[in-house]
Regions:
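Extracellular N-terminal segment of 7TM GPCRs
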Residues: 1-31, 284
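Extracellular TM2-ECL1-early TM3 structural module of rhodopsin-like
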Residues: 7-19, 46-105, 113, 159
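Structural signal for membrane-spanning alpha-helices in multi-pass inner-membrane proteins
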Residues: 32, 68-71, 75, 140, ...
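Intracellular effector-coupling site of seven-transmembrane GPCRs
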Residues: 56, 178-226
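Membrane-lumen (extracellular) interface motif
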Residues: 77, 146-159, 233-244
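Class A GPCR helix-loop hinge within the 7TM core
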Residues: 96-134
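Extracellular-loop-to-transmembrane junctions of the mid-late helices
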Residues: 139-178
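Seventh transmembrane helix
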Residues: 169, 218-231, 244-286
């Protein structure tokens, strides 16, 4: 009886949380998408990757979370409706995997920006980034369709992809940190001879690196609970795991509301554009 009450309370709490977070994800990501479109100082490859991530986060708030709330209500009423669950499964895999892949692609882009340096603009073109982003969405759609088929091995494949991406992204940032430290040691000597434009470009790159690192950290915190509970449930289901599993979904969806806040916090050009947008909407508060 206690376990049943605990599960019921968990479902209700997650209904409330996801109803609220759905609204924040929609509002914040719509503003972010508009701000990204109106920020000319961002390079096209970086803007494309950020837009893709914002669109996937908007999809989480607009489609995934409302459907998840419907699934939770269905569980509370103890009704089994396959149509709702199937819709949730497709949307969840589509947008969450696209968001997950978007963070990885963003990290890879910043790694290439600092690793290739002068060759970055030559090799990482807008067309190539668009091709990568398109491939991510196609792959996400395929995985979503496979999830609908209830293929057992899909959970193992998804867990493997998560592990590889976690490790690779961590290695990327270790390398980025090493390069930044190396550049910092040379900064005093370069400051005398480097042109102002070069110094400004270096500072801008460093700021975007810091911003994407925070995106990665928040992503890690939000996604790890879902990954851990998913792996644990492969070895058997328990009442505690059922409770934790519902909260782990909410943690993943929380990420879609936090990403826009990180952009505004750590990227001054986007923050300024957001301010301009808000001032145009609410002129009295300007």
């Amino acid at each position: 009886m206690t376990e049943a009450k605990g599960l019921h309370s968990t479902l209700v709490v997650n209904c409330v949380l996801n109803s609220f977070l759905s609204s924040t994800a929609i509002l914040l990501n719509i503003i972010t998408i508009q701000a990204l479109r109106k920020t000319p100082s961002l390079s096209k490859p970086l803007k494309t990757l950020l837009l893709s991530l914002a669109v996937s986060d908007l999809g989480v708030g607009f489609l995934v979370q409302p459907t998840y709330v419907a699934v939770l209500v269905m569980k509370i009423k103890q009704n089994a409706e396959n149509t709702i669950f199937n819709a949730f499964s497709i949307q969840n895999f589509l947008f969450v995997f696209a968001s997950f892949s978007g963070v990885f692609a963003l990290t890879a882009d910043r790694f290439l920006a600092i690793h290739l340096h002068l060759r970055y603009q030559e090799l990482v073109t807008h067309k190539r980034v668009v091709a990568v982003v398109s491939s991510v969405w196609v792959l996400s759609a395929l995985i979503a369709l496979l999830a609908l088929k209830r293929i057992q091995v899909l959970g193992f494949i998804f867990a493997t992809i998560h592990i590889v991406c976690y490790i690779t992204t961590g290695l990327f940032y270790c390398k980025i940190y090493a390069v930044i430290r190396h550049h910092a040691k040379q900064m005093n000597a370069l400051q005398q001879s480097a042109q102002n434009e070069d110094m400004a470009n270096a500072a801008r790159l460093r700021k975007t690196l810091v911003a994407t690192f925070y995106v990665y950290l928040v992503f890690l915190v939000c996604y790890l609970p879902r990954f851990c509970t998913g792996v644990a449930r492969m070895h058997g289901e328990t009442p505690l795991l059922s409770l934790l599993s519902e909260f782990s979904y909410t943690c993943v969806y929380l990420n879609s509301s936090l990403n826009p806040l990180i952009y505004c916090w750590k990227m001054r050009n986007i923050r300024q554009t957001v301010k301009n947008i808000l001032q145009s909407i609410f002129p009295c508060g300007a």
